Swiss-Prot record:
GO terms for molecular function: rRNA binding; structural constituent of ribosome. Transmembrane segments: none annotated. It comes from the Bacteria. This is Small ribosomal subunit protein uS15. Keywords: Ribonucleoprotein, Ribosomal protein, RNA-binding, rRNA-binding. CDD domains: Ribosomal_S15p_S13e (cd00353). It comes from Finegoldia magna (strain ATCC 29328 / DSM 20472 / WAL 2508). PANTHER family: RIBOSOMAL PROTEIN S15, BACTERIAL AND ORGANELLAR (PTHR23321), SMALL RIBOSOMAL SUBUNIT PROTEIN US15M (PTHR23321:SF26). It holds the Pfam family Ribosomal_S15. One of the primary rRNA binding proteins, it binds directly to 16S rRNA where it helps nucleate assembly of the platform of the 30S subunit by binding and bridging several RNA helices of the 16S rRNA. GO terms for biological process: translation. The keyword Ribonucleoprotein applies.
Length: 88
């Protein structure tokens, strides 16, 4: 999974201002990291259905945050999609 240092590094990279941990950009970046990690895990553990369900829930949560961001500020949304290399 990820430790405190990785999480802090992701937050620093995507925060909109100092001390920002709850903006959609930060939340989507953290979810994307976890989704990528779980995707790799499921490649070698094909029958881990509990983790697969968690992955689908995270993807849904990320989708909702991205929809919110695209409705609120389309430029921030496009910038985030480009920075994270998410296809949409």
């Amino acid at each position: 999974m990820y430790n405190k240092e990785i999480k802090e590094e992701i937050i620093k990279e995507y925060q909109t201002k100092e001390g920002d941990t709850g903006s959609p950009e930060v939340q989507v970046a953290l979810l994307t990291y976890r989704i990528n990690y779980l995707t790799e895990h499921l490649k070698s553990h094909k029958n881990d259905h509990h983790s697969r369900r968690g992955l689908f829930k995270m993807i849904g949560k990320r989708r909702n945050l991205l929809n919110y961001l695209s409705n609120k500020d389309i430029e921030r949304y496009r910038d985030l999609i480009k920075r994270l290399n998410i296809r949409r």
